[in-house]
Amino acid sequence: MSSTRLIPGVRLFQIRNISVSLAEIPFNILRLSFKKNKSDEIIIQNNSDKPPELVKHKSKSKFERCIDNDKDILLVLPRYDGNKKRSVVDIVQLKDFNVIHTYEHDITSMNNQINIYNSEYENLRVDDSEIRFEYRHPLILNDGTLVSHGESSPLFKIDVCSNLIWINQDERFHHSIELSNDNSIWVPSSMYPYSTIVGNYIDEIGFFDDAITKVSQDGEILFIKSVSEILIENKIKDLKLLDVYDPIHLNDIQPAKFDSSYWKKNDLFLSLPRVNEIVYYRPSTNKVINFIQGPFSWQHDVDITSDYEISIFNNNNSLTDKNHSEILIYNFETKKFSKKFNKSLVENNFKTSTEGLSEILDDGSMLVEEQNH
């Protein structure tokens, strides 16, 4: 009689992949019934696969005004339009909540230009079909063009009339999209093939080799560096970091737009929620200058708010005192944390488990997004 045992310390990627394949059998059966045209292009999905019509919030207003607001500010709002059964991006004027423009490009046409024979995108025409696709972290540029992705998907750019300009499918892009000082774009990606250190340690598919990626406005990758490599090369972590399939989960890259006593222009602040750290990194020298740990967990959205402070969106998924999310301010002079508008956030039962954004405006007020309460 033979027996099977699990050996401590061995990375069980193959077992995990087999388990995932078994779990996906019902979904793969469902895929077979998706409607296609003569070119084998998916055009619509089953009626049974469409999202249910939401009636719970039909009587509620889209926005609620709590105080008078005469700020001349525009909000870039990606949302799912239940009537159109697709994702759109609205440009909303906050002083009166009027939608002054909407982006909604042809998702099916874009998907048909993507190489589905690439293992990273073989299910894209199903997973990111028009009825499922979501615009993530759209960035509006000065000429009205929009750069976005669908989360772990190609990066793309459309014009103000929603015409597709370019697609980059070299990597899978995810989370934040930020403008650099030279008008390039910083965006997280997942590298495959893996970076050198990761590739020498792992040969199975399924590891998330998250990287900082700089993309030109023409869609070309100018710079890419694995965050796992950064941490290992700077001796902050060792190879044991790679024993977890998603050790980093990079969700924000914040470039420094100016010099200060505490950072240099073009330095980067990286949010790494899996290890509950903000890493201060200098790409020009491949050096981690500092890494910040503190009273935050599963954080999102690090922003530079002054010449000596950064804000951190603390999702606050700790084992204790986790009822509300917080916006923390870290002071580089005092090396201490404080909370921004915490009383108001608690009064409004502010909590988002794994997502969310915040923006501190020039007048000191703050805009927060509660994404999954």
Regions found by a protein language model. Name each.
Residues 1-373:
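Histidine-/acidic-rich catalytic cores in large beta-rich domains
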